Design a protein with these regions (language model features):
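Catalytic-core regions of core metabolic enzymes
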Residues: 1-224
């Protein structure tokens, strides 16, 4: 278990069945490990029981000053350090060359497809962050991080929903003054909203509100 590791640990990557995740995080809290990426799926997107598991995890995180990416995600790819937390087979998904585009995506499938397309088209990637169900860390945290990242010059976001409306607008406004942000908002119609809810448990919301938020914060909206 984590408790048997003698050294200090900066980050855990958790990829075990969903019902066991809470126990691992409680062990992590005991060792005062402050950061976790939860790859495991089977939470909010599965209904009421999954929502309750997420709430318990969130309480552990708050009580122990812990930051969590995920669950139901691939995690991160840093193309400049070759650090990745995903379990992708790079024999099946091409690795893009180093570049200046960073990707934020709620959808793991879209992130994989975009990485593969970028490699085929010769488009350079700096970082990819897939945050899935967004139990804690979301767009409002990640945009300031990419704003200050020396390798990132352009930011692309694939968005099903947003974490905190006002915080997101302020973060995007600050970021877009330094680097262009291009966002693809899915779930604009009834079918898209249903797909987002079944995929990451996200409530896609009123598209008109997103459109207004993009205009206010300087985000360039993509259509496709």
């Amino acid at each position: 278990s984590i408790l048997d590791i003698p050294d200090e640990v900066a980050l855990t990557v958790i990829a075990i069945p969903a019902p066991w995740v809470l126990d691992v995080l409680q062990q992590q809290a005991h060792k005062r490990i402050r950061h976790a990426i939860i790859i495991s799926a089977g939470f909010r997107e599965k209904g009421a029981e999954g929502i309750e598991m997420e709430e318990r995890i969130r309480r552990v995180a708050i009580e122990n000053d812990m930051r969590i990416l995920g669950p139901n995600c691939l995690g991160v790819l840093d193309n400049y350090t070759n650090f990745t937390t995903s379990f992708l087979s790079w024999e099946r998904v091409s690795i893009p060359k180093k570049g200046s585009l960073s990707i934020l995506s709620q959808s793991g499938a879209f992130a994989i497809a975009l990485l593969d397309l970028a490699a085929q088209e010769g488009l350079g990637i700096a970082k990819m962050i897939n945050y899935g169900n967004r139990i804690d860390v979301g767009e409002s945290d990640l945009l300031p991080f990419l704003r200050d990242d020396v390798h990132t010059k352009v930011i692309a976001i694939y968005m099903e929903s947003v974490d905190y409306g006002r915080r997101f607008i302020e973060a995007a406004k600050s970021c877009s003054k330094k680097k262009p942000i291009v966002a693809l908002k899915v779930g604009r119609g009834a079918a898209g909203i249903a797909a987002a809810k079944s995929h990451t448990g996200a409530i896609a919301g009123n598209y008109a509100l997103y459109k207004a938020a993009f205009l206010k914060s300087g985000i360039i909206e993509a259509h496709g």
